[in-house]
Curated annotation (Swiss-Prot):
It comes from Pseudomonas entomophila (strain L48). InterPro entries: AAA+_ATPase, ABC_transporter-like_ATP-bd, P-loop_NTPase. Keywords: ATP-binding, Cell inner membrane, Cell membrane, Membrane, Nucleotide-binding, Translocase, Transport. CDD domains: ABC_Iron-Siderophores_B12_Hemin (cd03214). Its main location: membrane. The gene is hmuV. This is Hemin import ATP-binding protein HmuV.
């Protein structure tokens, strides 16, 4: 579980996040939405410890985030940044296996977990391929498998932070990726995912944080956050919102 209280973050003299309060709960996905420059990636940087808040606190399982020793924190918290680069000709299996470095579970168990994580990310058929030979979308799925392997199987007490994990993916793999994330949360992990697609967020997230100029415009269920008034205020778009005819979650249609 990750708790954020009164978080403020500065970059130089500019405050990019102001008074952010949220809780990542076991078994749930929190989606973060907002226009470019709203502070989404800065928020993820503060939550993973890459950026230090100017005020407020981030606690992982009741303990200040920076008080956790590196490997111990890595066994509980995994991060998929917006861009992951790797310049070595590792096989896909080796790249995903990097997620197991904080653990001492043995080679056989690690191999089993790597195989399971690749399957969850719909990347099992890529296992023996060179990472450098993959397309951008394939690389994105491999890095998803890596962070899933780091926390596998996704039990309570683990937290997964994802920055636009569907940005390079075709429509099918956007859904298979978020289905894998949904399954991970259903097994007990707490998940935060930054998205740009409003309808994907409405379908897969339990709660949504809507950011505007570094502040929380709304934090609630998709039904309460994804309203025409809120989306017009934050994104400047005119939309129709109606229940999905089969699933019931909000369906957003641009007018």
């Amino acid at each position: 579980m990750l708790d954020v209280e009164g978080l403020h973050l500065k970059r130089g003299s500019s405050e990019v996040l102001s008074d952010i309060r949220l809780q990542l709960r076991p078994g749930q996905i929190l989606g973060v939405l907002g226009p470019n420059g709203a502070g989404k990636s800065s928020l993820l940087g503060a939550l993973c410890g890459e950026l230090s808040p100017s005020a407020g606190q981030v606690r992982l399982d009741g303990r200040d985030l920076h008080a956790w020793p590196g490997q111990e924190r890595a066994r509980r918290l995994a991060v998929l940044p917006q861009a992951s680069s790797l310049g070595f000709a590792f096989s896909v299996e080796e790249v995903v296996g990097l997620g197991r470095l904080p653990h001492a579970s043995g080679r056989q168990r690690d191999r089993e977990i790597v195989e399971a994580a690749l399957a969850a990310a719909d990347a099992g058929h890529l296992a023996s391929r060179s990472y450098l030979a993959l397309s951008g979308g394939e690389r994105q799925r491999v890095h998803l498998a890596r962070v899933l392997a780091q926390l596998w199987p996704g039990e309570a007490g683990t937290t997964l932070l994802l920055d636009e994990p569907t940005s390079a993916l075709d429509p099918l793999h956007q859904h298979t990726t978020l289905q894998a994330v949904r399954s991970f949360a259903d097994r007990g992990a707490a998940v935060l995912v930054i998205l740009h697609d409003l309808n994907l967020a409405a379908r897969y997230c339990d709660h949504i944080l809507l950011l505007e100029h570094g502040r929380s415009h709304a934090l609630d269920t998709p039904q309460r956050v994804l309203t025409p008034a809120a989306l017009n205020a934050v994104f400047g778009i005119d939309v129709l919102v109606q229940p999905h005819p089969e699933r019931g979650h909000p369906l957003i249609i641009t007018r």
